[in-house]
C-alpha cells in the first residue's frame, strides 16, 4: 500500500496533501459498505467522535460500532446491542436528535433491508422506532450525506447484484414524526440506479453517477426541496467520468466526491463541485494519492491544531464562527457550544475509512485531507 505522510495529533495539515491517521486502540477491521459519521461532543466531552457502523467483508456482515475519539486520539469498540447486521446502508443525524445516529436500509447476506434503527451512544443501545407509514422497498442505499434538517431523502438504490430498484420516487423520512412520504416532484428524475452519491447542500440534493447493469452514469442531477423540481445539470469544468460506489460530502458551496469504480478499475481521484457556479474541478495534490477504492465511507471532521508549524491560513478557523454558516456541512460544528474546548482553532478534514479495490483487496486504513 502507498505510504502517505502521517498526521500526528495536534499537527497542522497542509493543503493538497493526503495523510494517514495512525490511531491506536480497537480499530475496525477491513470492511466495505460501512457508514462513517461525525458526532459533535455531548455532555462533558471535549471533542467529538467518528462512528463507523456496520459494513461487511467476504465472510460476514457486521453489527458493530467503532468510535474514534478525536480528543483522546483513540479507537474503541463500543458494545452497542441491537443493530441488525447491515452494509451499504444510509446513516444520518437529524436536527431533532443531534446526539443520535440513525441508519436505514442496506443489506446482509440473506437480503436487503428497509428498516430504520437508532443508536443512543450514551446508553450504547440500538432501538427500532415504530414507523406508521409504508417505507420504501428494501434496498441498498450507501450514503451519510442525504439528510436536511429532520429528513432523510432516499432515491434509487440496489435491488440485486448490479441491478437497481426500478423505483424513481423520492422517499422522505421525517425523524420527528416517524413517517415516510413520497412528495410529488416536477421535472424528470434520474433513471434507476444504485451506487450513486446523494449529497445535501443547503436546500438542494445532488445525485451523481451510479450504475445500472453494466452501464456507468456520469450525469449530475439536482432537486431543490423548496420547489421539488428535478433538474439535469450541465456543469462546466473537469467533470468526473461515469463511476459508482464513490462517496461524497458537502462543505459550504462545495461538494467533494472521492474514489469509486469505473470499468477500468478503482479511482483515487477527488473532485470538487461548486454548487452555485455549477463547475467541476479535479483537485491536484502535492504528494502521493491514496490507493484507489470503492464502497468506502467518509465524513467531515474538525481537526484540533495545537502545535502548528506553519503560518495560519484560511483553512484554520474557529468552529464557533463556522457554525454560523447555514449549510449541511456545518452540522459538523453547529452542536458544539462555548463550553467545549472544540471552539479552539481547528482545520476541517475529509476523513475516509476502508473500502476496497477491484482486485478484492479490502482496506482498514483511515486517510484525511484538508477541505475548504
UniProtKB/Swiss-Prot annotation:
It is found in: Cytoplasm; Endosome membrane. Interacts with PIKFYVE; the interaction recruits RABEPK to the endosomal membrane. Interacts with RAB9 in its GTP-bound conformation. The modification Phosphoserine is found at residue 133. This is Rab9 effector protein with kelch motifs. Coiled coil: none annotated. The lineage of its organism: Eukaryota, Metazoa, Chordata, Craniata, Vertebrata. It comes from Homo sapiens (Human). InterPro entries: Kelch-typ_b-propeller (IPR015915), Rab9_kelch_effector (IPR052124). Rab9 effector required for endosome to trans-Golgi network (TGN) transport. Phosphorylated on Ser residues by PIKFYVE. GO terms for cellular component: cytosol; endosome; endosome membrane; intracellular membrane-bounded organelle; trans-Golgi network membrane; transport vesicle. Residues 321-340 have a biased composition (Basic and acidic residues). GO terms for biological process: receptor-mediated endocytosis; vesicle docking involved in exocytosis.
Amino acid at each position: 500500500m502507498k505510504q502517505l505522510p502521517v498526521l500526528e495529533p495536534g499537527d497542522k495539515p497542509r493543503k493538497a496533501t493526503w495523510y494517514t491517521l495512525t490511531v491506536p486502540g480497537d480499530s475496525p477491521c477491513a470492511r466495505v459498505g460501512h457508514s462513517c459519521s461525525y458526532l459533535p461532543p455531548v455532555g462533558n466531552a471535549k471533542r467529538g467522535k467518528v462512528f463507523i457502523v456496520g459494513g461487511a467483508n467476504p465472510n460476514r456482515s457486521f453489527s458493530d460500532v467503532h468510535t474514534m475519539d478525536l480528543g483522546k486520539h483513540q479507537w474503541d469498540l463500543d458494545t452497542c446491542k441491537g443493530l441488525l447486521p447491515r452494509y451499504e446502508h444510509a446513516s444520518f443525524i437529524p436536527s431533532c436528535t443531534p446526539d443520535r445516529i440513525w441508519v436505514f436500509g442496506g443489506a446482509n447476506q440473506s437480503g436487503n433491508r428497509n428498516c430504520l434503527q437508532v443508536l443512543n451512544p450514551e446508553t450504547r443501545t440500538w432501538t427500532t422506532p415504530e414507523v406508521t407509514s409504508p417505507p420504501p422497498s428494501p434496498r441498498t442505499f450507501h450514503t451519510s450525506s442525504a439528510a436536511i434538517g429532520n429528513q432523510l431523502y432516499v432515491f434509487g438504490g440496489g435491488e440485486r447484484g448490479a441491478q437497481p430498484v426500478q423505483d424513481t420516487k423520492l422517499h422522505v423520512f421525517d425523524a420527528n414524526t416517524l413517517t415516510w412520504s413520497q412528495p410529488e416532484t416536477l421535472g424528470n428524475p434520474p433513471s434507476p440506479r444504485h451506487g450513486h452519491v446523494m449529497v445535501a447542500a443547503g436546500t438542494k440534493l445532488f445525485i451523481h453517477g451510479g450504475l445500472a447493469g453494466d452501464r456507468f452514469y456520469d450525469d449530475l442531477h439536482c432537486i431543490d426541496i423548496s420547489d421539488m423540481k428535478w433538474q439535469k445539470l450541465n456543469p462546466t469544468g473537469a467533470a468526473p467520468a461515469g463511476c459508482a460506489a464513490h462517496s461524497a460530502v458537502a462543505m459550504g458551496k462545495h461538494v467533494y466526491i472521492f474514489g469509486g469504480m469505473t470499468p477500468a478499475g478503482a479511482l483515487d481521484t477527488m473532485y470538487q463541485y461548486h454548487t452555485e457556479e455549477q463547475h467541476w474541478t479535479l483537485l491536484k495534490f502535492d504528494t502521493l494519492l491514496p490507493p484507489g477504492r470503492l464502497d468506502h465511507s467518509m465524513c467531515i471532521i474538525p481537526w484540533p491544531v495545537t502545535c502548528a508549524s506553519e503560518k495560519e491560513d484560511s483553512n484554520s478557523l474557529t468552529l464557533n464562527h463556522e457554525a454560523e454558516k447555514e449549510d449541511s456541512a456545518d452540522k459538523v460544528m453547529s452542536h458544539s457550544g462555548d463550553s467545549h474546548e472544540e471552539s479552539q482553532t481547528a482545520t476541517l478534514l475529509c476523513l475516509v475509512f476502508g473500502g476496497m479495490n477491484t482486485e478484492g483487496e479490502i482496506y482498514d486504513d483511515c486517510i484525511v485531507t484538508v477541505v475548504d
